[in-house]
Amino acid sequence: LKADIIIVDLGAGISNNTLDFFNLSSRGIVVTNPEPNATQDAYFFLKNVLYRRMRLFAKINEPIKRAFDDYIDRNGNGMFDFGGFREFLNRHQQGARKEYNNFLNEFNPRLIVNKIRSIRQNGEGTWFINLVKTFLDIEMEYLGGLRFDKRITQSSEKLFPFIYHFPNARITKGLFSILSNLNGIDLPRHEIRTFKQFRTLLKEQQKQWH
């Protein structure tokens, strides 16, 4: 498939397949809305994605593996907390802390906030990015927000793209603004040309968990 960017809608959930597909992407995009339940789900999704990435990274990075195992042993309850792990590295594993920083710097997902209904909710994107930075040490990029528009539902019911029928609508202009930010210049190129190659890559990654 000849394309500069391919977008796959993974849907909601934190199944291993969803997490692995997200981790296979060059830079995953999280789409949420300002409702508390939605932002909470988005945060826990990113937390699970990061944890799965780190467990895989620990299998190929000995300092991180030792630090992770040591942290779990000292913690006593078998639970993992990113903030606690960060403090543990700062106190006991300075060498692994550098490796951990490099690992985090390679994960920069993007964010879109959908169904914004008020001026106050315009700040939800920045708030969420700051939350993720504080507790997960992840640097996210905010692609933009989209205002709530009931015409989206109408378009969906009639099975036609709203951008064609409402080209001057605020949400259409907002969508094109996001698309202008979604460039492929900084994205690594995948040397994958067929679905068979993609399926093979996914199976190889899944083997790492067994």
Predicted regions and their residues:
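Alpha-helical scaffold elements adjacent to nucleotide-binding pockets in ATP/GTP-utilizing enzyme cores
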Residues: D20, L24, D41-F45, W127-L131
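Well-ordered beta-strand positions
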Residues: I5, R27-V30, R110
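Conserved Switch II/interswitch segment of TRAFAC-class P-loop GTPases
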Residues: G11-G13, S26-P63, D69, G76-E87, ...
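Phosphate-binding/switch loop-helix module in NTP-utilizing enzymes
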Residues: L1-F21
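Alpha-helical elements of the RecA-like P-loop NTPase motor core of helicases
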Residues: N16-L19, Q40, Q154
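Signal for well-folded cores of large energy- and translation-related assemblies
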Residues: S15, K47-L50, K133, N183
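C-terminal lobe/tail of nucleotide-utilizing enzymes
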Residues: I64-H210
